[in-house]
Regions:
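Active-site and channel-lining beta-strand-loop segments
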Residues: 12, 177-190, 291, 297-307
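A glycine-rich dinucleotide-binding beta-alpha-beta segment and adjacent secondary-structure elements
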Residues: 70-75, 80-90, 95, 264-320
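Long, amphipathic alpha-helical stalk/connector segments used for oligomerization, subunit docking
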Residues: 351-369
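Core beta-strand elements of the Rossmann-like FAD/NAD(P) dinucleotide-binding domain
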Residues: 98-109, 308-312
């Protein structure tokens, strides 16, 4: 339902020759089920939702004469405190980064959608903003957290040059035929298939390679094991002295797929390595290694409404906890955002309708406290 909704907003999902939405394999998936836009699905969803906001503002402009009468976007803004009144959230206090000017929002309901905490690790795929600030604000206000000990390290982040260490190398590379090799040129993942996965994953290169063209009659290549298994295997190879020059391993797709295939299926990865590392992935392997990627923990929420234990406070996306267990499957973060973001929004509206639209007033002394 949410994928269809995103298409009505303008998202351009890849299609099969039969006209159906294309679905690809990611690590840990038993079946290909990830709807995608090349290798840049997340960027396409951001573009689509930004475009939808602009469209709604244009509609408001026609209806009221004010494009910001319904939706107002505050860019480059940092929240530093949630405002509370009688045990219920009543807004937020923050500042504009460009000017340093302080200001406050009052609201009958607040949704925390501030993402994760990956930037607390030295090597991470996350942006500089992912420092867990939203979680800290909610915890100070009295919200409870869950599963904070579970942080996923994606197995493939860039290793060189130092300025881009940790930048994500999408799992799509392995889903489309890329394999992991150590410094000896060996596909080492066959040595790291846990007993629990033996019946599902190939034990020879020949069978693993056949899976790409005949998945119904062959076992999956071990490069597509769940992310924690692949990250541990890479770390073991590096510790055993079989790593790449900069402390990772090699991800090779150039020797296995044509240049046309790679540039068509993985355009973002091709340009990312060409521009940031001067590596042509159609001709040479990529250096990759584990990178801090996703926090499974977050605010404890009701699974149907995304409500926290604080009246009027809701949470969605990576800032919420409990949905992904201890190890999220690849692709499920975007599914999480689309499904539970909608639930959080609907529940916040229902809360306000039930408890009233009136927002509390805060004095200057309260804001400065």
């Amino acid at each position: 339902m949410r994928v269809w909704e995103l298409e009505t907003y303008g998202a351009l999902f890849d299609r099969t020759p039969e006209g159906k939405i294309s679905q690809r394999n990611f690590g840990g998936h038993e079946y290909p089920r990830l709807a995608h836009v090349g290798d840049r699905t997340g960027l396409e969803l951001i573009r689509t939702l930004q475009q939808k906001v602009t469209s709604l503002q244009q509609d408001d402009k026609k209806a009221t004469g004010d494009a910001e009468s319904g939706i107002k976007v505050f860019a480059e803004t940092t929240m530093i405190r949630l405002l509370m009144r009688d045990g219920r959230v009543g807004g937020a206090f923050g500042y504009q980064r460009a000017t340093g000017d302080f200001f406050s929002f009052t609201a009958a309901a607040v949704i925390i959608a501030t993402g994760g905490l990956g930037k607390t690790f030295k090597v991470t795929s996350n942006s500089w903003e992912s420092t867990g600030d939203g979680l800290a604000l909610a915890l100070r206000a009295g919200a409870t957290a869950i599963n904070m000990e579970f942080v996923q390290f994606h197995p493939t982040g860039m290793m060189w040059p130092p300025s881009v260490r940790g930048v994500l190398v999408t799992e799509s590379v392995r889903g489309d035929g890329g394999v992991l090799r150590n410094s000896e040129g060996k596909r080492f993942m066959f040595n790291y298939v846990p007993e629990v996965f033996r019946d599902q994953y190939a034990t020879t290169e020949e069978e693993g390679d056949r899976w790409y063209t005949d998945p119904d009659n062959n076992k999956r290549p071990p490069e597509l094991l769940p992310r924690d298994e692949v990250a541990r295997a890479i770390n073991a190879e590096v510790k055993a002295g079989r790593g790449s020059p900069h402390g990772g391993v090699f991800l090779d797709i150039g020797s296995r797929r044509s240049e046309e295939f790679i540039r068509r299926r993985l355009p973002s990865m091709y340009h990312q390595f060409k521009q940031l590392a001067d590596v042509d992935i159609t001709k040479e392997p990529m250096e990759v290694g584990p990178t801090g990627h996703y926090a499974m923990g977050g605010l404890e929420v009701d699974p149907d409404t995304q409500a926290t234990n604080i009246p009027g406070m809701f949470c969605a996306g990576e800032a919420s906890g409990g949905l992904h267990g201890s190890n999220r499957l690849g692709g499920n973060s975007l599914s999480d955002l689309a499904v539970f973001g909608k639930r959080a929004g609907d529940a916040a509206v229902a809360f306000v309708d039930e408890h009233g639209h009136q927002t509390p007033k805060f004095s200057d002394d309260e804001l400065q406290a």
